[in-house]
């Protein structure tokens, strides 16, 4: 998916004036116009109005400082013919996918693993050692994939490939700090204004923009904001043929209330299961999230009308929308009021008693935040139970080795914020972004 701001001028691969640099790029740079003006002021001359060309001139001007100046969803690679160096980066949230294969002197990269199949040097091998992780949490919680020697470039990271050596560095890290200097009303205005500006930035395109709409607050908020400036924006919703499982009536009711055209389709059980094999092929790796099926049909329907859609994904991680974030507040209060030794004792006793109201709270209240997170996100808490599903034994890490290193990096933060930070580096990156990326849909 290439740039839309300059449909003709943005053709790729794109070269600089003397042909020494070449760039390929997937995504959107929302602040490309501001960067373009800055580069023109620095003496650069542009032949197009595309953001691909901004990347080329930006690399000439700023080198590996370029990714830190970009606002958007992107992956890009620039080859420097003079230095025989390859440079690339992925956006800070990992919205756009980037896979690479690095083995026996062969370096391949792409937005999809299946693109590597066209190269005769690519060895398609199952990465069996990662099966225990996948069965435990339903995704691979690191840079590896289910294919041997195929890796994911982490979000907020850039890489350099030179003389057969690959170097990966982080250019951005999500940081949290508490600012008590403003009132609730002031923060409400700041968030509202920032949200409106962000939605406007996402609509910079030469083609019509639509919106995905469910019955949730996040997508409803996006559609409502878009409709303020684009009254005839189309909303797209999907539901199930069995009404009791469908959110479609709520989405259509909201569309009607704000005066936005609603385009909807329904999925029945037969369609659901028939489409699953094809969907897994598109996603390259196994994906157990059931939302993949309705999303596939939603995207198929939307593409008949528009090329670009906005959605509300990522809001739960950013604004603390998941139930476990709210539960964490109660655990914090419990920890402040009850000494650790007493909490440990209460949890140990409760775990041995028959079920009673409050038992699970006492058991979880005796645990560390990473243990509570693991309990909420694991399919198999017992490695022995998980390993019984496998045909052979693998040297897999214990459950605590998956998430504890992430929590160790944010120990000084309150528990809800720790959960948000970990989700942004794991669940959102390896599940949500893969599921909702336009490349897969």
Where are these regions (language model features)?
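Residue-level signal for inorganic ion chemistry
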Residues: 27, 55, 159, 255, ...
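Hydrophobic (often cysteine-bearing) scaffold residues that line and stabilize catalytic clefts
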Residues: 31, 48-51, 70, 127-128, ...
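N-terminal segments that mediate ammonia production and transfer
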Residues: 33-53, 79-185
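Alpha/beta-hydrolase fold catalytic core
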Residues: 419-435
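Acidic loop->beta-strand submotif enriched in PP2C/PPM serine/threonine phosphatases
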Residues: 4-24, 74-77, 141-152, 197-201
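Catalytic core of PPM/PP2C metal-dependent serine/threonine phosphatase domains
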Residues: 49-84
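Active-site loops and adjacent core secondary-structure elements that bind or stabilize anionic groups
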Residues: 1
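ATP-dependent adenylate-handling active sites, centered on carboxylate activation for C-N bond formation
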Residues: 41, 81-108, 175-403, 435-441
């Amino acid at each position: 998916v290439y740039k839309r701001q300059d449909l003709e001028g943005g053709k790729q691969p794109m070269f600089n004036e003397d042909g020494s640099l070449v760039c390929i790029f997937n995504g959107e740079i929302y602040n490309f116009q501001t960067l373009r003006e800055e580069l023109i002021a620095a003496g650069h001359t542009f032949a197009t109005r595309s953001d691909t060309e901004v990347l080329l001139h930006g690399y000439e001007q700023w080198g590996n400082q370029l990714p830190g100046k970009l606002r958007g969803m992107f992956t890009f690679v620039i080859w420097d013919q003079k230095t025989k160096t390859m440079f690339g980066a992925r956006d800070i949230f990992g919205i756009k996918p980037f896979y690479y294969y690095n083995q026996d002197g062969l370096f391949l990269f792409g937005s999809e693993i299946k693109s590597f199949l066209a190269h005769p040097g690519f060895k398609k091998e199952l990465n069996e050692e990662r099966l225990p992780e996948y069965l435990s949490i339903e995704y691979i919680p690191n840079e590896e994939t289910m294919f041997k020697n195929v890796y994911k470039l982490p979000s907020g990271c850039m890489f350099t490939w030179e003389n057969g050596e690959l170097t990966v560095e982080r250019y951005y890290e999500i940081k949290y700090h508490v600012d008590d200097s403003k009132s609730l009303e002031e923060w409400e205005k700041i968030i509202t204004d920032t949200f409106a500006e962000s939605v406007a930035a996402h609509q910079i395109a030469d083609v019509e923009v639509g919106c995905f709409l469910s019955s949730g607050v996040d997508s409803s908020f996006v559609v409502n904001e878009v409709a303020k400036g684009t009254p005839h924006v189309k909303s797209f919703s999907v539901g199930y043929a069995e009404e009791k499982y469908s959110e479609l009536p709520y989405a259509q009711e909201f569309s009607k209330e704000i005066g936005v055209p609603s385009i909807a389709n329904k999925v029945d059980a037969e369609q659901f299961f028939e489409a699953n094999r094809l969907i897994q092929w598109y996603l390259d790796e196994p994906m157990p999230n059931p939302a993949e099926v309705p999303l596939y049909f939603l995207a198929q329907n939307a593409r008949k009308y528009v090329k670009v859609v906005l959605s509300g994904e990522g809001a739960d991680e950013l604004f603390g929308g998941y139930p476990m974030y709210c539960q964490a507040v109660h655990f914090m209060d419990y920890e402040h009021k009850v000494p650790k030794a007493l909490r440990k004792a209460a949890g140990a006793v409760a775990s041995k008693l028959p079920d009673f109201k409050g038992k699970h709270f006492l058991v979880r209240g005796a645990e560390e935040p990473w243990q509570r997170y693991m309990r909420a996100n694991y399919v198999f808490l017992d490695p022995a139970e998980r390993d019984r599903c496998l045909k052979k034994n693998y040297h897999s890490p214990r459950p605590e080795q998956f998430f504890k290193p992430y929590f160790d990096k944010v120990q000084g933060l309150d528990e809800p914020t720790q959960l948000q930070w970990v989700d942004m580096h794991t669940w959102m990156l390896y599940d949500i972004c893969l599921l909702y990326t336009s490349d897969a849909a």
